[in-house]
Amino acid sequence: ENLDSLSQKETEEYISAQKNANLGFVSDPLLKWDDIFRPFANLSGVTPTALNRIYEMNTFYRVLSFDGSAFTDGGNTVKSNLDSSLPKNKTVAIPEPFTFAELHTSNEFKRKEDFVINLAKMLRVEIDSLVESGFEVIQLLAPSIAYNKEVDFGVVSDALKIITDGLKAKTILHTYFGDVSTKIESLLNLPVS
C-alpha cells in the first residue's frame, strides 16, 4: 500500500472509532495536514518558507509568508483539506488569528495588530464556509495565548469578534503549551462560546 491509501484508511478508522464511541462531535484526525497551518500555504499570496520548531517542542511547522493584503480563496482552504466521510455532527480545529500572526510573517502588514485582524477576516470566510457545510463546533487553537507571557487581549478580542459575531456555530478557544492561570480573567472575557 502507498502512503496516501494508508493515511486514508487510518483517517476512516479514526472517524469510525469516534462514531462508535457515540461522541457528541466527530473530527477529522488531520493526518494529511503536516501542521495546523499547512493548508493555508495554498492561498494566493502566501509562500511557504522555512521549517520552525513550535514553542521549543520537537514539533515543526512551515512558516508562511503572507505577501499580499488579500489572502483568501473564497473559504474553501480548510474544507477542501478535510475528509468527506465526516458525519453530520462534525467539528473542526483551526488556528486562531493571534497565534497565526505570532508564528508567521507578512510583507504587507508591518504592525502585528493589522496582520491579526486581516487573518481574522480570512479565517471568518473559512469558518462561514465550514458552518454552511454543516460544522457545528469550531475549535480555535490558541497555543500562543498560553505560551506568551504577554498577550494583547484587546487585539485577541477584536479578532475573535470578527470570527464569532453572528456565527451560527459554537466556538471553543483551546489554549495549550503554557499555564494560563494568570490569564483566566482575560480569557473568560473573550467572545467565544
Locate predicted features:
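Domain-level signal for soluble alpha/beta catalytic cores
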Residues: 1-193
